[in-house]
């Protein structure tokens, strides 16, 4: 009891009630404060308000035109052919990437001037045609329900980043577009670019997804707060055979370019080009053979033939061609006329006599007999 009473007395001596204390400044001895100290110094201090975000407002329709910016931002792709075995190939003529579903697509990021520290690279997919550009590009329901990946990327996102644990998958608050962001990395020594490995997780032909609608992938270089530093874009087709599709589309593209070139040529020049092209086509007439005889191609070729019968046939053809190089066209025409006359006689078409006399046929008796 004695100890508890002593503790109560100690508590009463050290406890300061709010009525007695008043303001906290009364607890401080005046001898420790300078004479010019103002106890109301903190009365006019305002509480700092949160600043609005410096990120630019997101456009409802993203711009896909190239913008290298002050840093000279551009993209590169590894060289690849059109073999059927390739899983990813890029066409510079079409500015189009052909790839298989969920296969690695390396894209090289190149800058002339290093961007600020903390810059990021953002990849966004949009539809190419104006009638579809307002829609969000997302995976089809079938692939969206398919379990794949490491679980870091949302199931609806078309574009994913491979081999980078710092990738962040975003969905815009304004237009709900999907994007994936990775930090910009300085190229390693001896290299002029940084490579990002992308995957496209749905086929272009999938119903309920892209549904054969062409898409563009926009790669943008941004600061950490979203300010645009550079932008590039390219078309993407996700298909089963990238090499075959690239070869077909490049062939069609070249044909279209040739047609457009002919359309730009005036009609008079076009007719002259047509005449020149038709005159260069080989014809079996004698005049053309005369031109062939004057050809400067004197090289001799050897052809191996199996079987004597074929050899005799090809030999006759060769002898005829050699003869046509020597015989003038007029003699050739005269020879053809003789062949036609002989052919008519063999068919029994005998000429009628000029003065009405009956022409006797073999084994036919005359009237006198």
Curated annotation (Swiss-Prot):
Record's cofactor remark: Binds 1 zinc ion per subunit.
Keyword Protease among UniProt keywords: no
One annotated Gene Ontology cellular component of this protein: nucleus
Cofactor(s) needed for function: Zn(2+)
Chain spans, region Disordered: 246-296, 318-369
Region (Interaction with DNA): 237-244
Pfam families, per the entry: P53 (PF00870), P53_tetramer (PF07710)
Annotated segments matching region Basic (repression of DNA-binding): 342-365
Residue positions binding Zn(2+): 140, 143, 202, 206
Keyword match RNA-binding: no
Bias-annotated ranges (Polar residues): 269-281
Annotated motif Bipartite nuclear localization signal, positions: 270-289
Keywords: Activator, Apoptosis, Cell cycle, Cytoplasm, DNA-binding, Metal-binding, Nucleus, Phosphoprotein, Transcription, Transcription regulation, Tumor suppressor, Zinc
PROSITE patterns attached to this UniProt entry: P53 (PS00348)
CDD domains named in the record: P53 (cd08367)
Record-annotated site: Interaction with DNA: 84
Region spans: Transcription activation (acidic): 1-28
InterPro entries: p53-like_TF_DNA-bd_sf, p53/RUNT-type_TF_DNA-bd_sf, p53_DNA-bd, p53_tetramer_sf, p53_tetrameristn, p53_tumour_suppressor
DNA-binding region(s) from the entry: 66-256
Protein function: Multifunctional transcription factor that induces cell cycle arrest, DNA repair or apoptosis upon binding to its target DNA sequence. Acts as a tumor suppressor in many tumor types; induces growth arrest or apoptosis depending on the physiological circumstances and cell type. Negatively regulates cell division by controlling expression of a set of genes required for this process. One of the activated genes is an inhibitor of cyclin-dependent kinases. Apoptosis induction seems to be mediated either by stimulation of BAX and FAS antigen expression, or by repression of Bcl-2 expression.
Domain notes: The N-terminal and C-terminal disordered regions undergo liquid-liquid phase separation (LLPS) following homotetramerization and activation. Post-translational modifications, such as phosphorylation or lactylation affect the ability to undergo LLPS. The nuclear export signal acts as a transcriptional repression domain. The TADI and TADII motifs (residues 17 to 25 and 48 to 56) correspond both to 9aaTAD motifs which are transactivation domains present in a large number of yeast and animal transcription factors.
Family annotation (PANTHER family): CELLULAR TUMOR ANTIGEN P53
Family to which this protein belongs: Belongs to the p53 family.
Subunit and partners: Binds DNA as a homotetramer.
Name of the protein described by the UniProt record: Cellular tumor antigen p53
Biological source species: Barbus barbus
